[in-house]
Amino acid sequence: MNRKVLIPSLLLTLFLALISQSGKASADECLNDMKTRVKGKENCLAIHTFLTVSEVKPSTLVIFIHGDQSDGGPVSGMIKLAEDVDVPAGVIKIALLRPGYFDKSGNTSSGTSWRRKDSYTPTNLDEVTSAVQSLQSHYQISKTVLVGHSGGAAYAGVMIGRSPGVANAALLLSCPCDIRRWRAFKKDAPWSSLSPSSFAETVPTTMKVITITGEYDDNTREYLAQDYIETLAKRGVSAEFRRAVGAGHNDIVRGDVIDEALRILLRLD
């Protein structure tokens, strides 16, 4: 046997084993304090929690889910939005980092982002859905609103149809609501990501959904959200498309763009 081949092979096996054990440990040893970390199905997801000091018992969760952040940098925009946007007393705002992402402070969600491409997988959707359900149970929440931007909007759109009851309402910003058509437009194929359009028929008719796409969004074009909303509306879901005048794909993540829509979705019966 050639020892020169055997030794590198053994080293590679040990290296891969260490990586596997490290990833498992990060999930098993999750702090899970429901303020900075929450356990998903198998992974430990970083979160930022914003709760206004009030005598009112918390009754509503607003979960902010960021986009793909394709520049490879830290997640920041949706965390700032979650911190800044005004909500009534009794509303807990939580910005959640998708599997494999990190923020400016180095807080990281375990799992994989699939190089920030094609990452709306069943496994990742299960992680985020499980995390939301854990937060609901911990805070004994009766109402939940999902706010997603771009890839985060795809997450939210899939979740409300794939896991009916996970939320009462969803605000989808710059939504690539039909992944097949979005990928075709971007000339990206093949893909494995789940699409909100594939789950439109199972979104509960009790849901409230608002999509907002920027007038100058050259990434997730308006028709992707418009057609999705039309499908929901035909089924009797309270669904509305809005155009953000003068806004592009990323600068739609601003309080002045979403304030009114979020107020509407928070007025849940």
Where are these regions (language model features)?
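Gly/Ala-rich beta-loop-alpha elbow adjacent to hydrolase catalytic centers
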Residues: 147-152, 156
